[in-house]
Amino acid sequence: VCLYFIQKEDISDADALRQIHLATGLTHNHLRCHIASGLYYFIAKAIVTMAPKNADLKTCIQYGLEKGFAFYHTPESLAELMYFQRLRDLNEFFSLPEDEIESDGYVLHALEAAIWCLLHTNRFRDCLLRAVNLGDDTDTTAAIAGGLAGLYYHYEAMPQEWVNAIRRKAWIKRLCLQEL
């Protein structure tokens, strides 16, 4: 859903996020989940717009988080934003040891774990392996980290043996190339 709205230049962030929140709400209809989805949107948008201009991944993530925190700096969201406090200073967050990163599938932990993996690796493969090796809810953490890593490192950076193992690969490629 985020990628669909990122490529739509005629829609505002506020309108895109209303739709993203509706999609998030299908399974996780809580403001904290909406904020996490929104932060993901802003990070993904920063990667898509800044990486082609040679911005490093940390800069893209920082910019996306700043945009997200500014967007959600509203009276109704302030109490929930405190839960995302560790992500406000990426240098401090980067310095956290692995045993302080939770990967239990809880929305906040999943986003933090994905960002931590992105910051501690410099290749698509390494990022996903790091996410999986955190343990617990590995599919959630790897899906979030992998989506963002894929945007930054691109399809060509994916290990060929992983790409070859994808089921219905031709259908997925066609879907990705279609205008939705």
Residue ranges, per PLM feature:
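Extended hydrophobic-aromatic, low-complexity segments
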Residues: 124-128, 140, 159-161
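Active/binding-pocket-proximal capping segment
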Residues: 134-135, 167
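Amphipathic alpha-helical interface segments
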Residues: 1-121, 127-133, 148
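Conserved glycine-rich phosphate/nucleotide-binding loop
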Residues: 151-180
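Conserved phosphate/anionic-ligand binding catalytic regions in large, soluble enzymes, centered on
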Residues: 138-150
